[in-house]
């Protein structure tokens, strides 16, 4: 375990303290099979999915309106 901590410390020598602490907590949870570590990188992901879906729906609707008006006129 000491070798693991030494290797982790060597990798994160130039990065902020929070990155090292988060990584050590993740490694500890993996080694002990705990499910206590939560990801903070995925906070606004659902908002982006909805925005992309709405964008494509609007794009398809505009295409259908254009084709309809092209046929009618």
From Swiss-Prot:
Membrane topology: Single-pass membrane protein
Reported induction: Expressed in the late phase of the viral replicative cycle.
Keywords carried by this UniProt record: Late protein, Membrane, Transmembrane, Transmembrane helix, Viral penetration into host cytoplasm, Virion, Virus entry into host cell
Primary location group: virion
InterPro entries assigned: Poxvirus_I2
Pfam families tied to this protein: Pox_EPC_I2-L1
GO annotation terms (biological process): symbiont entry into host cell
Domain of life: Viruses
Compartments in which it is found: Virion membrane
A GO-annotated cellular component: membrane
Membrane spanning stretches: 49-69
Keyword Protein transport: no
Family statement: Belongs to the orthopoxvirus OPG078 family.
Task performed by this protein: Late protein which probably plays a role in virus entry into the host cell.
Protein's recorded name: Protein OPG078
Record organism: Vaccinia virus (strain Western Reserve) (VACV)
Species lineage: Viruses, Varidnaviria, Bamfordvirae, Nucleocytoviricota, Pokkesviricetes
Gene that produces this protein: OPG078
